[in-house]
Regions:
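Short, positively charged loop/turn segments that connect secondary-structure elements
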Residues: 37-53
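Long, charged, low-complexity intrinsically disordered regions
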Residues: 3-7, 88-90
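An alpha-helix initiation/capping motif
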Residues: 8, 30, 49-52
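Short acidic, hydrophobic short linear motifs in intrinsically disordered regions
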Residues: 24-35
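Short, cationic-aromatic polyanion-contact patches
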Residues: 69-92
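Positively charged, polyanion-binding regions of nucleic-acid-associated proteins
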Residues: 5-26
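Basic amphipathic alpha-helical segments that dock to polyanions
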Residues: 57-58
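A short, conserved structural fragment
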Residues: 62-68
Length: 92
């Protein structure tokens, strides 16, 4: 049985992936779970709750944005399918 990734490992992967994707592009949170957990659904699927918790914390810190239906979501109250992206640059 593979070991469970830490929140710090998930954060590192999440920030790397959204940065790699670049401004104006977004990321499916399952991609983060797959990077840290593995390609099989029974490996990455159980990590989705922790991925969401890390995403909420990073959004509250202003380091990423959680999108729901293409718009920034309330980190304390969103449901369903969501995406991750970089916050707008200060020059924008």
């Amino acid at each position: 049985m593979p070991r469970k990734p830490t929140p710090e490992e998930i954060e590192t992967a999440m920030l790397a992936l959204v940065t790699e994707r670049g401004a104006g592009k977004n990321l499916d949170p399952t991609e983060v779970a797959r990077v840290v957990g593995g390609d099989k659904p029974d490996e990455w699927g159980p990590l989705m709750g922790l991925v969401r918790q890390v995403a909420v914390r990073l959004m509250k810190q202003g380091r990423i944005v959680i999108l729901r239906k293409g718009r920034p979501a309330d980190p304390d109250d969103f449901r369903g399918i969501y995406r991750l992206t970089l916050p707008p640059s200060p020059e924008a």
